[in-house]
């Protein structure tokens, strides 16, 4: 039995922003149609969906700049109604203290990787090994354990503008790829990133802890020993 693990935050925003000029009932109907289409595309026997609730452990980790401090606060008009609909009609779960991304990871790593498919449009989740489905591109793809680690260390280099995580100045995805392309294991990835940060372990640790998505409850990333 394959279970679809759905990051529902982006789903609500995508449907919500496209429905700002409509009535609430139309926005909910669009969400319902999107969910039905998703289930047909994936042909899964089961699904679990997650929404981000209150609190985030990352807020206390961010020292360089506030976590998500630059994020534009504009929200879709019907966001709350859409979230409530997914909870009441589809059984989605609101998680607190973590993000929906973390909840997807915890659920994915609790079972063998061929029993789930992670449904999202967020590159952050590409650090998880296993099957993924980008519902915007309608693309199914597989990420290996090492590919997931490389994606994670790439983000430590580049940072994440959306979440206000500051990377190295002048390093985007292309330069980051060049820095990491010779690496074959996690220690080499870490050493390459540490060298790029001129040995600043604290900055690497801070960015890593902000960017690392949980594989089990209460997990916080630590520097490789």
Where are these regions (language model features)?
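Domain-level signal for Mg2+-assisted phosphodiester chemistry and nucleotide/NA-binding surfaces
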Residues: 1-84
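Extended two-metal-dependent nuclease catalytic cores across DNA- and RNA-processing enzymes
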Residues: 27-30, 44, 68-224
């Amino acid at each position: 039995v394959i279970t679809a693990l759905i990051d529902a935050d982006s789903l609500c925003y995508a449907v919500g922003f496209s429905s700002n000029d409509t009535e609430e009932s139309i926005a909910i109907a669009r969400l319902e149609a999107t969910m039905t289409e998703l289930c047909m595309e994936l042909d899964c026997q089961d699904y679990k969906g997650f929404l981000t609730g209150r609190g985030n452990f990352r807020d206390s980790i961010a020292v360089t700049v506030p976590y998500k401090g630059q994020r534009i606060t504009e929200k879709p008009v019907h966001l709350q109604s859409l979230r409530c609909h997914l909870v009441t009609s589809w059984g989605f779960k609101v998680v607190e203290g973590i993000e929906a991304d973390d909840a997807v990871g915890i659920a994915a790593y609790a079972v063998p990787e061929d029993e789930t498919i992670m449904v999202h449009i967020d590159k952050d989740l590409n650090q998880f090994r296993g099957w993924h489905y980008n519902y915007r591109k309608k693309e199914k793809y597989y990420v290996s354990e090492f590919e997931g680690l490389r994606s994670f260390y790439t983000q430590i280099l580049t940072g994440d503008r959306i979440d206000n995580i500051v990377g190295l100045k002048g390093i985007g995805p292309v330069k980051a790829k060049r820095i990491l392309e010779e690496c074959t294991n996690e220690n080499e990835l870490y050493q390459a990133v540490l060298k790029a940060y001129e040995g600043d372990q604290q900055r690497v640790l801070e960015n890593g802890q902000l960017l690392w998505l949980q594989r089990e409850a209460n997990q916080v990333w630590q520097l490789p020993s």
